[in-house]
Regions:
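Non-catalytic signal-transmission and effector/linker regions of two-component phosphorelay proteins
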Residues: 1-14, 112-129
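Conserved acidic carboxylate
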Residues: 19
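Two-component/phosphorelay signaling modules centered on CheY-like receiver
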Residues: 22-41
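Acidic, metal-coordinating helix/loop segments flanking the phosphotransfer/catalytic sites
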Residues: 42-60
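Active-site residues of response regulator receiver
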Residues: 64
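Acidic catalytic/metal-coordinating carboxylates
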Residues: 69-74
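Hydrophobic/aromatic residues positioned on beta-strands within the core alpha/beta folds
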Residues: 87-89
């Protein structure tokens, strides 16, 4: 008898997770694993997130809009420069997303599995800016 492996996402497998709250980051990582994604890198501070955004090997990023009181805009800018798709995660709704990026997919906190799955698919299907 052979083991059945979970279905892998079709277009991307590796995710950069940028979230300052450790428990939320851990929950998100578990949810991503359940959906068949791998966390390629994680960051909880702007400096770490910028470094990962510029150098890590990943297919998609999830960005908390506020990292310990600092807006995540520089990280989003770095991802755009690399042509990488990303999703914002926020508990503030649309007003929490930086103005230049209001058209990006937004994942509302608290996370729900189906919402996460849909936002990742939306980001992957969209154009890489």
């Amino acid at each position: 008898m052979t083991a059945v492996t979970p279905a892998q996402p079709p277009a991307a497998k590796r995710v950069l997770v940028v979230e300052d709250e450790l428990m939320i980051r851990m929950l998100l990582e578990d949810m991503l694993a359940e959906l068949g994604y791998t966390v390629a890198a994680e960051a909880g501070r702007i400096e770490e997130a910028l470094q990962a955004a510029k150098t890590a090997d990943f297919d998609l990023a999830i960005l908390d809009v506020n990292l310990d009181g600092e807006p995540v805009l520089p990280v989003a800018d770095a991802l755009v420069a690399r042509g990488m798709p990303f999703v914002f995660a926020t508990g503030y709704g649309e007003r929490g997303v930086p103005d230049p990026y209001r058209d990006r997919p937004m994942l509302k906190k608290p996370f729900q599995m189906e919402g996460l799955k849909q936002m990742l698919q939306t980001a992957l299907e969209g154009e890489k800016n």
